[in-house]
Regions:
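Catalytic beta/alpha-barrel core
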Residues: 1-9, 32-34, 61
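Charged, low-complexity, helix/coiled-coil-prone segments
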Residues: 2-12, 169-178
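Active-site glycine- and acidic-residue-rich loops that bind
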Residues: 4-21, 95
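Structural recognition of alpha->loop->beta junctions
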Residues: 20-31, 108
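Conserved active-site-proximal phosphate/metal-binding subdomains
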Residues: 28, 38-90, 96-223
Length: 223
């Protein structure tokens, strides 16, 4: 089993690697740094995400996170040296084109993780209606949303999420016991049910996770 933590901040990387080092005398095999433009659940507070979102300039957003990336890499390097091994670092979040990939590698990372760009491809096995939701989305449709897991997420606004953001509670049809500590009678909606709707292409009832650049998709392409 490999240890591959996903972190967004220097503090998170330091705590995780220190814990594994002290308790298990092990370190990570790989570290993924997920930036503020990623899709799905995000390792930032809503306030931090809104601060990044205040700037529409893509270059600014990238550079404003560069210092954090370098700090995380320094933490990883410390444990790489201690254990005498290579710990590859992969950068994710907002890497949509060649320029973004080039910028990521200029920071010294070993690899990149790309998701949103590949959703609207023939090779992606997502339901066609899910892909079409990306293609139809405008920049303004992509918002930071509520999630039952207690973390902010990035998704496409649709009838389902409009109800949630308006304060409506959508009761789970059946509790699947998917999350420890979850209280079905209190959560705004069931994360599993909403993601299953997305997988089935039932986009009006789904949580449509996406990266910040999903609106840039114009058509179904091929890899």
């Amino acid at each position: 089993t490999t240890l591959e933590p996903i972190v967004s901040k220097e503090g998170s990387a330091a705590v995780i690697l220190k814990y594994w080092d002290r308790k298990y005398h092990r370190t990570a095999d790989l570290v993924v740094i997920e930036g503020p433009k990623a899709g799905g659940h995000l390792g930032f507070s809503r306030e931090q995400l809104e601060e990044y979102a205040e700037y529409d300039d893509k270059e600014y957003t990238e550079k404003s996170y560069d210092d954090e990336v370098k700090k995380i890499m320094a933490v990883v390097r410390k444990y790489s040296e201690k254990y005498g091994c290579s710990i590859p670092v992969v950068l994710a979040g907002g890497i949509y084109d060649r320029a973004a990939a080039k910028h990521a590698f200029s920071l010294g990372v070993d690899g990149i993780q790309v998701a949103t760009r590949f959703v609207t491809t023939e090779e992606c096995d997502a339901d066609i209606r899910y892909k079409e939701a990306y293609i139809r989305a405008n920049k303004e449709d992509i918002q930071i949303v509520k999630s039952p897991v207690g973390m902010p997420g990035r998704a496409i606004m649709n009838p389902f999420m409009e109800r949630v953001m308006a304060g409506e509670r959508i009761s789970p049809k059946k509790c699947l016991l998917c999350m420890k500590g979850c209280k079905p009678s209190e959560i705004p909606y069931c994360i599993t049910e909403s993601l299953l709707h997305a997988a089935k292409g039932e986009t009006d009832e789904a949580l449509l996770f996406c990266g910040a650049d999903a609106w840039r998709a114009e058509k179904i392409e091929t890899v």
